[in-house]
Amino acid sequence: MSQFTSSYDPTSFEARLYAAWEAAGHFKPSGTGQPYTILLPPPNVTGTLHMGHAFQQTLMDALVRYHRMCGDDTLWQVGTDHAGIATEMVVSRNVVLEGHGETRDSLGRDGFINKVWEWKQQSGDTIERQMRRLGVSADWSRSTFTMDPQPSAAVTEAFVRWYEAGLIYRGQRLVNWDPVLKTAISDLEVENVAEEGMLWSIRYPLSDGVTYEHVEHDAAGNEILRETRDSLIVATTRPETLLGDTAVMVHPEDRRYTALIGKTVTLPLTGRHIPVIGDAYVDPTFGTGVVKVTPAHDFNDYQIGLRHRLPMIQVLDDAACIVSKTSIQSGMPSGATSDTTNTPSDPEASSAANQHDTLVMPAHLAGLDRYAARKQILADLDAQGLLVAAIPHTLQVPRGDRTGQVIEPYLTAQWFVKMETLAARGLALVERGAVTFVPPNWINTYRHWMENIQDWCISRQLWWGHRIPAWFDTQGGVYVGRSEAEVRAKHALGPEVTLTQDNDVLETWFSSQLWPFSTLGWPDPTAMAEHGYARYLPSSVLVTGFDIIFFWVARMIMATDHFTGNVPFHDVYITGLIRDAQGQKMSKSKGNVLDPLDIIDGITLDDLVAKRTTGLMQPKLAEKIAKATRKEFPEGIAPHGADALRFTIAALATHGRDIKFDLGRAEGYKNFCNKLWNATRFVLMNTADDTAHSPAQHQAGQDGQDAPRTPQPRTDAEQWILSRLTAITAEAHAQFAAYRFDLLAQALYEFAWNEFCDWFVELAKPALNSDDTQAAASTRHTLLYVLETLLRLLHPLIPFITEELWRQVAPRLGIQATTLMLRPYPQPQQLETAAFANAAADVEWLKIMVSALRRIRSTLNVPPSRRVSLLLQGDQEVDRRRITHFATALHFLLKLEHIDWLGADSAAPPSATAIVGTLKLLVPLEGLIDVDAERVRLDKEIKRVESEIDKSNGKLSNAVFVQNAPAAVVEQERSRLTEWTTQLNGLRERRATL
């Protein structure tokens, strides 16, 4: 047993305890019991722990620790993601910063990848070290990196199988394109930002001198304009893509333009004739009701182009500059099947069958950046009298989350997965309950995405990642296989056939979707047996955020179903998004990010300011952020310890969409830990000579571990606390099952702070100080027993302090086990219902009595050592019985000189008064306080009780409440009103005597 310090200092034991747990192998699966598995959403290997990580990992760890204590065979599968784009950016920047004159491109693919592995070896485990500081009890020996050989083999296998099943194809499609990284990116990597822009109106002349009668009507249908026009006025926010227009579009029921559908207009600056088409996509009320259609540069236009079989003209290159020439591609969707003879190897070849003409761009525009091209095109339009108007307009601008650059819809050859069949099965699994969402409303989000799914672009133009297992010959034929050797053998390709592997890699989500089973050895049977594939799949629960329900959760369900015939997990617990105390999203640019390690270990103000202002994408914000930080944290952030942060997270974990993190809550829960520490010191000091360590005081538990003897209570206070302990134990199990960590934390907090620390410790003092040695011994044992049980109840949420305290308490109960984390989680005890219920009711009455009299003492500023007299008036037999029964406790707890009863008609001296039910409590004021002050106190109390009566009357006069609330609740409210009314009458009567 280590030395027990007098004050709570988490720095003195948290790191020590974690190292001991890990060294002893306590985090590893036991191999016995019911399997309980949790998958950690693998954080980026480039990353550091942020509040979102800390939030989810705390809840996961609580579940794992709880189920481990329940005897389950727990596996928390952890690992990191190779994070293709993020890692490539970090290492590319580092290569330049090393100052050797090297760049990513100068190193070449192999040299650069070697640099990435070097970097990963040096700093790739940062986030796992930080997770340990939080208390994550994962089996680190099974930590997996998505680029490790086993998961890499799984990626190749999955790609080949899907390709052979006809689910993967290569085709020309529109994708999100980052012109800085020069790669396709996923929707999740695109942030739509509201920005101020312009809406330009451009005149598109009708072909061949055609004119039409343009008529406008107001909302009532009255004609307000009629004129002959020879052009259509098109509204657009992107004039730089005008060169790629292949139609203009109106709503088919817009009376202004219906006669023009099927006609053509002359595309400005080009002389090309493009059709006027009708499509219900158009909003007739937006702009002029006429929009340009540029299928190669807008996602909505792309779909419209497919519907109307419009040509597609790509006018921007991969750097978002105007091309010098381009091909007109037909409006047929491009994409090869799994036939290994017809999939081309590059964008030019992939659409060869769909090309029928070549366009040369205006020479003065070729090579211009898109924004320079916009400026020039607008100038050209204005010079030709075709620019009608430009008005300010707020629009959603898609920006890459890595580079901050505006993302371009870009037509390029990529690899895709056909999703329709996979999605139908994935949706059916959830609909029939094979996978359950918590809270259940998130199934609607899942359903919406699955019912509106598009084929998935899985290729990325990067070097770091899983290289696509496809090889091209010189004729553009593609061959997919697990290796080049397999490809050559399967297709009888001799050495004279030159094969070149695809340069692209698979997007990170492709490997992440295999996480539930690739981490368990799939597809290698030997590895599967070693990793417990059959035992640990499906996992029990996935804890994740709502923002990746589609990108990760849905894909895991689909992939696991297809490749294993199983579901990846039974439950999906969706957490909210952590925001700051004002409800704002935490972001570097806002300067409101909180680092969980700074909350745990503390940080000086200067270091905090430096952390928040370094590396800003907008350096001009630094001064504002520094000023706000100094105002909010004038002393920096004090260390709170891991437990205080964890308990804060649990308490905040509602089932809502957004969660406001307030550092003040962490301070409050640090105080809670301190309260628990001091209560334990009290118990230990008062049980130092106890005999609880003798063999008679403990018994063998059902699991073979030593278990403390169940108390045989000799006092009402013991019976009360044991009944409350049983109730709180049952509630803890229920809240864990419901993933209601907030209600769990609240219940345990109330029990620990109010019922155990504040009340039972106080109520135990009379017995501990009495001459009744049996009652004293029983109380000491119950103190230890309840405290030890409470520490076990709290352990999943606050593992460090509970372990440290338990190691002091356990020996007093004769427990031989060496660690709390492997002790059984408490189970509700079977109590003698009637006896315990009666004792509990009596103690609740005693608590009210003590509280009422302490309020009087506090209000009157009576010194704690000053003894007072208590006069009682009332005719309830139960009150007289309780007063007699608890006389010793009342004298001890309230510093009473004596207790006397007054007759109903007896005149009482001037007294401070309180009412408990029908019992009137009077503390004579003579020599105690100023009578005027007592009048003020009574007036205040009368107002308080009147307010409570108003609340009850309000409820009972509400027909909806009376009709819909359970009868017991309504009756309880009526009883409460009666009690308040009785109290008010007594208070007014007493006030009248002063």
From Swiss-Prot:
Q: List all Low complexity biased stretches.
A: 696-707
Record-linked CDD domains = Anticodon_Ia_Val, ValRS_core
UniProt motif 'KMSKS' region: location: 585-589
Q: Name one GO cellular component term.
A: cytosol
Task: List the GO molecular function terms.
Answer: aminoacyl-tRNA deacylase activity; ATP binding; valine-tRNA ligase activity
Q: Enumerate composition-biased segments (Polar residues).
A: 329-345
Q: Which InterPro entries match?
A: aa-tRNA-synth_I_CS, aa-tRNA-synth_Ia, Anticodon_Ia_Val, M/V/L/I-tRNA-synth_anticd-bd, Rossmann-like_a/b/a_fold, tRNA-bd_arm, tRNAsynth_Ia_anticodon-bd, Val-tRNA_synth_C_sf
What's the Enzyme Commission number for this chain? 6.1.1.9
PROSITE patterns for the chain: AA_TRNA_LIGASE_I
Region forming the signal peptide: none
Q: Which family does it belong to?
A: Belongs to the class-I aminoacyl-tRNA synthetase family. ValS type 1 subfamily.
Q: What does this protein do?
A: Catalyzes the attachment of valine to tRNA(Val). As ValRS can inadvertently accommodate and process structurally similar amino acids such as threonine, to avoid such errors, it has a 'posttransfer' editing activity that hydrolyzes mischarged Thr-tRNA(Val) in a tRNA-dependent manner.
Q: How does it assemble?
A: Monomer.
What name does UniProt use for this protein? Valine--tRNA ligase
Q: Which organism is it from?
A: Xylella fastidiosa (strain 9a5c)
This chain is encoded by the gene named: valS
